[in-house]
Amino acid sequence: MITYRQDSLFLKGSFSRQIGIPTKHHDITHAILMAAGCIFTKGSFVKDIPYDPNYYFYGEELSMALRAFTHGYSFFHIPDVPLFHLYTDTSDIPRKLHWDPEDDEKRAVRWTELDKKSLNRLDDLFADKVEEPMNLGFDRSLEDYTLISGICLLYTSPSPRD
């Protein structure tokens, strides 16, 4: 299952980190987030929810999830997922990541600048300032997302639950 990391809610403004958690569910369950590298859906998804090149790492999956949700797509976790994205090696073998200082020195635009632009883009998405085709849809609202997720992205707070 993919969910928000409780220790990283609104870590950088409106951005919250996600985490994948293995579960022992035996049934298909509703989901509130998605992993960009593990999307199984109809082929028209890439036209309905095109990849937004204005994101660099942080924000891309949340943006896609919110755009898909507001365009009427639903997410599900299935038992016995046939693949897994191993982002961090469990044996703790060090490896370079894209924000490695040595590599970052060689870039025309630094990781920190790309990160700022990504997070600003996410804020613009929440404020409905992003134009088609990268905008939020009209089938569901961010308020609808708050109801199912318990996270109010507009006010950067957990939503009170009754």
Give, region by region, the residue ranges found by the protein language model.
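Catalytic cores of eukaryotic secretory-pathway lumenal/extracellular enzymes that build
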Residues: M1-M64, T70-D124
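Generic recognition of cysteine residues
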Residues: C38, C152-Y155
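C-terminal domain-closing interface element
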Residues: V109-L153
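Conserved small/polar residues in nucleotide/adenosyl-binding loops
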Residues: Y155-D162
